[in-house]
Amino acid sequence: PIEDIGCVVLENQMINITLPLLNELVKNNVAVILCDNKMMPTSMLQSLDANTTQAESLKFQLAVSEPMKKQAWKQIIESKIANQSAVLGLAGKNKDILKPYYNNVKSGDSDNREGLAAKVYWNSLFGNSFKRERDGCPPNALLNYGYAILRAAVARALLGSGLLPNLGIFHKSRDRKST
């Protein structure tokens, strides 16, 4: 059944899809992701069907205090680094190398544990010569694709909760969407 679908990725430029199907997917909170001619996700369909909790959620989101944002960011970074550690373990690498980073994240990640851990993570996973870049050599394109799919899944969950993914906590720039 359609309600069991979490995500549909439309990659091929020759795809034909009907409006009733798109409406049914959106109605069932399916993340419909559209890709460009390089098969990179560029956008996602979202429901504009307003409900009473959406307005309340948006008001709450806009009113979040700076200390609360910093604590939320701290928790996100701790989880991100802990998950990177788990990936290293699954890849047969030393997962404990990231422990000092996720155990010492400060409010708002004021001393950039995320960035420091990322360097250690990527070097551990792919070797010291690997450089993580938006348009870099492989496997960057695959990582970027996966990241776009994950970002769409998070956006879907936020939208489903009445929150706007565009109003992030930090990481605001043209190239990096709000987080």
Kindly label every feature range from the protein language model.
Residues 2-56:
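Glycine/small-residue-rich interface belts in oligomeric ring/scaffold proteins
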Residues 27, 39-178:
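Active-site helix-to-loop segments that bind/position phosphate- or nucleotide-bearing substrates
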